[in-house]
Amino acid sequence: MLCPSTFQPHLSPFMDFHWPVRSLWPETRPLFFQFEQEMMRHMQEMRHNMEFMERLHQRIFDEIDHVSPMTTFKPISFQLGKEGSHYALTLDTQDFSPEELAVKQVGRKLRVSGKTEKKQDDGKGSYSYRCQEFRQEFDLPEDVNPESVSCSLNNGQLQIQAPREGNTVSNERVIPITYTPAVKNPALQNSEPENQAVEAEAAEN
């Protein structure tokens, strides 16, 4: 019977020293290798995040390209009339809501403004914003008190009214005449009988 040691090569201590030695279980890795793997994982996450942000920015830019804002500045029609003894100004504001209108009185001037914004969809995935804005200024007549101006909104018509007070400034005025009754002088009253007696005596002669 052959001995198993017969088939095993004879290894000297010097030959064992040159063979690589590693542990098969449990598996161990150098610390630098783990650090490198961690860095690679972080870099990959950063790359994914950058690609996501790039796609997000591109989507935002595409949405902006689909929106084409259009702003229109134009005055609105108005009618200035006189209703009896009132100053009346009517503006066509049917395209504006009450919250989109403003009326200010500065001295003897009226400043009327409005701004509206509406979204319009063309049915093809694109839409636009239609903006309309106006600013108009009016002078109040001299016979209108600025403090008495009032405005109202009725059926899309902005109505501004104020009572007329007439011509308050005039170069002509009536000056009343004041008088007191005349008082006779007492000395003159005492000399009247003497004068009458002298006149009577002269008539007899």
From Swiss-Prot:
sHSP domain ranges (all copies): 67-180
Tissue: Expressed specifically in the rostral-most somites at 24 hpf. At 48 hpf, expression continues in the rostral-most somites and also in the notochord. Somite expression was restricted to the vicinity of the horizontal myoseptum. In adults, expressed in the heart.
Keywords: Stress response
Conditions for induction: By heat shock in the somites.
Extent of Low complexity compositional bias: 192-205
GO BP terms in the entry: myosin filament organization; protein refolding; response to heat
UniProt xrefs under Pfam families: HSP20 (PF00011)
Family: Belongs to the small heat shock protein (HSP20) family.
Record's protein name: Heat shock protein beta-11
Organism of derivation: Danio rerio (Zebrafish)
